[in-house]
């Protein structure tokens, strides 16, 4: 069942991450982002946003690393933000599309550049395809107690790379610990017990039995 409450939390985290990303991009050299910082500073912020929105979308000349590596990865992270919370592939794609289009391309980024044709297509489409592959891979990692090649450190790191939003929030909520407990219960591992009460000549007798399965 889709977890709408957690999806809103994820969206809030994405908003904070978007602000942080803009700060980092602003600090990069102009040739890394193709933003004309000197000219942008001459135009009021919201006037600049409206100007860019009216002119777009256009085919951009951004660094291919941004367009064809980082944007698909960002799209996969958006997709996983919904998919890992019980949403279908279609619902997760819609969420990815909305975040990449309205939150980013016509949102934060439009304050600095005209919306991009490549980003409007590559981020949600390629990102969702990549995201579904991430989802399948992460499910295998989680089912294996967050281990890869026997290493929980490696498994946890890979899970975070595949699903950074949910894993970051989950680190504060203790989600991994709870998942490991659920895995042990499904396998019949851990401590289990039972109690009993029976009549006797002196009244009632009772007892408790404990079993630990390895």
Where are these regions (language model features)?
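Hydrophobic alpha-helical membrane-anchor/signal-helix detector
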Residues: 3-31, 64-109, 120-138, 160-168
